[in-house]
């Protein structure tokens, strides 16, 4: 059985006026469906670069990256867009919330922008809010939430 995401000796480099700098080198990583992963490290250690490569927002220079056993080296923009929409979710250090919207409205906005019909959203939004333990904050504006709740 193949992993949801698998990196084999993946590297990312940046070329600049002062030469080549390394984003990260020879990373081996396997992620399975439903697995929760936290990438940690010092500032400048390549965490964001790695996540951008995994999500297809940036390319890699060496190695192999597989999505459910499929080699991504031939992926086109449309393939990465489909992959991100279906399988990838990032949580950013700086919150990307509309402060004047409620918890419910923020989730609804993301779902509508990703192409879902409003009629499909209500039940799923309620499930997601329950899943993360924010049921009592459903109608609370994002600006009133603590950092942890955001």
Regions found by a protein language model. Name each.
Residues 82, 141-149:
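Conserved ABC ATPase signature
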Residues 101-110:
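Short coil-to-helix segment of the ABC ATPase nucleotide-binding domain corresponding to the Q-loop/switch region
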Residues 71, 108, 119-137:
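Conserved ABC ATPase "signature" region
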Residues 2-4, 13-26:
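A short, flexible loop at the N-terminus of ABC-type nucleotide-binding domains that lies
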Residues 55:
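Helix-to-loop junction immediately C-terminal to a conserved catalytic motif
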């Amino acid at each position: 059985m193949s992993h949801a995401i698998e990196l084999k000796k993946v590297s990312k480099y940046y070329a600049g006026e002062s030469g080549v700098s390394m984003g990260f080198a020879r990373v081996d990583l396997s992620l399975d469906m439903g697995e929760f992963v936290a990438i940690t490290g010092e500032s400048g250690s390549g965490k964001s670069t790695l996540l951008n490569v995994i999500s297809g927002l940036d390319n890699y220079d060496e190695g192999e990256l597989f999505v459910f056993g499929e080699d991504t080296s031939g992926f086109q923009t449309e393939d990465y867009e489909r992959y991100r929409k279906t399988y990838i979710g990032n949580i950013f250090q700086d919150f990307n919330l509309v402060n004047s919207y409620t918890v419910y409205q923020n989730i609804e906005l993301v779902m509508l922008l990703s192409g879902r019909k409003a009629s499909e959203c209500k039940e799923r939004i309620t499930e997601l809010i329950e899943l993360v333990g924010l049921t009592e904050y459903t109608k609370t504006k994002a600006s009133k939430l603590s950092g942890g709740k955001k």
